Amino acid sequence: MGSINNYISENNHVEIIGIPTTDEGLPVRDCIRALRSRGLLRLFVEGGGDTVTRFFNGGTLDRLQISVAPTVFGSGRPGLRLPPTPTAQEAFRPKQCSHFQLGDDILFDFELEKVWPSK
């Protein structure tokens, strides 16, 4: 796989922002700060378990959408990994939850704004 520069030309009006990675991967808060400094106020992130977990655990999401399909894959990487919760009072609870039927699938839409436990 080549460099991203092979796929994006200057004619696309694209700015490539370099964010140094850490041992844990891409620091999502640094990504958000870099985008906000350029005037971007909303960001749609679509990804698998690692990406969603990184943004969720980083406290950078204000909305989370998870679709559930009637398909059994067996063992594998979980869709969302969270640290253990010692008590029910400390459990994560979305501000609002809606669900939508999409054929045989169900989409859960969680509003996360201002629901993070205080530390």
Task: Name each model feature, range by range.
Residues 1-119:
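Enzymes that bind and transform nitrogen-containing heteroaromatic metabolites
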